[in-house]
Amino acid sequence: MENCNKVCISLSGGLDSTMLLMHYLARGFEVRSYSFDYGQKHDIELKKVKDNIKFLQEKGLPVSHQVINLRDAFSDSASSLYGANNEKIPEGDYREENMKSTVVENRNVIFSSIMYGKALGWANKTQSNVLISLGIHAGDHTIYPDTTPESQSMARELFRISNWGSERVDYEAPFVNLHKDELLTTGVGAMRLMGFQDSDIETVLTNTHSCYTPDSEGRSCGKCGTCVERLEAFEKAHMMDPIPYI
């Protein structure tokens, strides 16, 4: 989208969405970020993301943050990620069939719809163009149908035809064809473009959380699907993951 320097992003506090945030900040965007409390089994990500936002704001970067409560909206979820369910979260690679239990019904489409409304309001108030963006990537497609390019394309068209003023809002997912190691190096590269030192980059990465089953001290298990994928990404990127593991 031309003449656009505003973006609304979904910021879970995980690695993918945090690298998405760096991507836009490095390009000079004003970022409004949104985290969603949908009743997940722990809130470590939500705490970590606040640490990163504070760190970035203290650097004078144009980012705001809001946590949106969606617990009631997801109260009937059958996902193993939902806190009220007793189902054990499976271990192993995302490509394995049992990982389907971690799918949260329609989650990314719901998040996108809320962000589209936020972006449209921002666009109308400022008479400017606004993007919405998610940090979904190629590794998500195997298990999460609402992260595929086809799903995202259809959602984009649905939002466009369902609202007046949609010419001011566009939807993009810049990492949709990248694997996790590629988005990691993209995000780190963005931080270096902004003049971040190694210690700054380590702070940002330390303030991300991916694990589905952390211990009581917040350490990652290293065995669940998202831990396996994260560790693999750091290895392929020839980087050390700074977060603590059990």
Question: Each predicted region: which residue ranges?
Answer:
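Charge-dense, low-complexity polyampholytic segments
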Residues: I132, E202, T206-H209, M239-I246
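Iron-sulfur (Fe-S) cluster-binding segments and ferredoxin-like electron-carrier domains
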Residues: D215-I246
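Short amphipathic alpha-helical surface patches that serve as generic macromolecular interface elements
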Residues: Q152, L184-G187, L205-T208, C221-C224, ...
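ATP-dependent adenylation/nucleotidyltransferase module used to activate substrates
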Residues: M1-I201
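Immediate flanking context of iron-sulfur cluster ligation sites
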Residues: Q197-G222
